[in-house]
Regions:
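Positively charged n-region of N-terminal signal peptides that target proteins for export
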Residues: 1-3
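C-terminal motif of bacterial Sec signal peptides marking the signal peptidase cleavage site
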Residues: 12-14
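Helix-rich interaction surfaces within compact, conserved domain-sized segments
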Residues: 79-133
Length: 133
């Protein structure tokens, strides 16, 4: 009986899956390349300030760009996938405080019919900046 109790966590771990993001299509990759052209990636950060008048740009159901200025754009790979975002659904982010942080719950919804279409969480933010002259 003890052997079964010891093996139960291993059996449950074997059932868990890993998340593989959907690769970008050629059109999505071109959109991201155009937005990040001339910018250099930096080290990942877990939180960024919410800036007024800035928006997330949806690249795919699991990739977002957060434009702070022409000189600074953050790339975010979602944890999970909000598939509806790629179709143009509305993104809803639940934040706690004045920052967007890794793990903040994000969902997508089709507001024309009032149905949620996906749930995911924000991942790490990778800053892309203009290189120093």
């Amino acid at each position: 009986m003890r052997a079964w109790i010891c093996l139960a966590p291993l059996a449950l771990a074997a059932c868990s899956g890993t998340y593989e993001p959907t690769p970008l299509t050629d059109k999505q990759a071109a959109k991201m390349d155009k937005a990040l052209a001339g910018l250099v990636p930096g080290d990942k950060v877990t939180c960024v300030n919410r800036e007024p008048q800035t928006n997330f740009t949806v690249i795919s159901g699991n990739t977002l760009l957060y434009k702070v200025s022409r000189k600074l754009i953050y790339k975010n790979e979602l944890i999970g996938s909000c598939n509806g975002l790629a179709r143009g659904d509305t993104m809803i982010v639940r934040t706690f405080g004045s920052q967007y942080c890794r793990g903040d719950i994000t969902s997508s919804a089709d507001l024309t019919i009032g149905i949620p279409t996906g749930n995911c969480a924000l991942g790490d933010f990778i800053p892309y900046r203009q290189p120093a002259p």
